[in-house]
Structure formats: C-alpha cells, structure tokens
C-alpha cells in the first residue's frame, strides 16, 4: 500500500480575480487529486480490513464492534514514541485528538494492525505499529 502525504495543501487568498480564479481551479484539482488518493488507499486494503472499517463506521467508532474482543477506542498518543510517525496535530478548527482501533482479533496480545480515527473525521491505517500511516478517510 502506498503511503499518503499527511500535509493538507492550503493556499492563501489573492486580491487579483484572475489569479484567485486560477488558484481556486488549482485548489479544486488538488482537492480532487487528494480525495482520489484517499479512495485509492482505502481500495488497497484487504477485504477483511475493509470489512472491519465498515463495522467501525457503522458503529460510529464507539469502541468494540460485535464479536470483536479487541482494544477499540483507546486514546492514541500522537507522536508518543521515537519510532512513531506523527499525524497532524491541528487543522483550521483546532486541535485534533486520536483514538486507536484494532483490526485483527488475536487470541493473546495485540498485533500491529490499527485504524487511527481523528476527531476531525480522518481515519488512518497502519500495519507496522504506528511507524507509517496511510490516510483512508
């Protein structure tokens, strides 16, 4: 799975209408491209991962999903260790907090596959215990 950039491509305003129009068209193109990349990232998940994503979506990301004893809905400490990648800490609306959700049911302990859900509605996937993240929503 390809890793998606975590930057959100913001642009400033310009007083020139032709320049502003050009920038607006560029922003639409960039947003469409960014959204397509997120859809492509989601589509690269395995069927099991997509199924679990849909179960969490249906439950409103409120913790455990039916038949799934796992660690779901616990606080994810963004940048909490030296080996962890760092997710965006803020957006235009303020601070973003994150919760983690296991993907696989294991008999003992936990594996490295997780969804990380942001308070801004974003969802990231990691299969290497937070070393890398791919945005899927």
Language-model region placement:
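Functional cores of ribonucleases/endoribonucleases
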Residues: 54-137
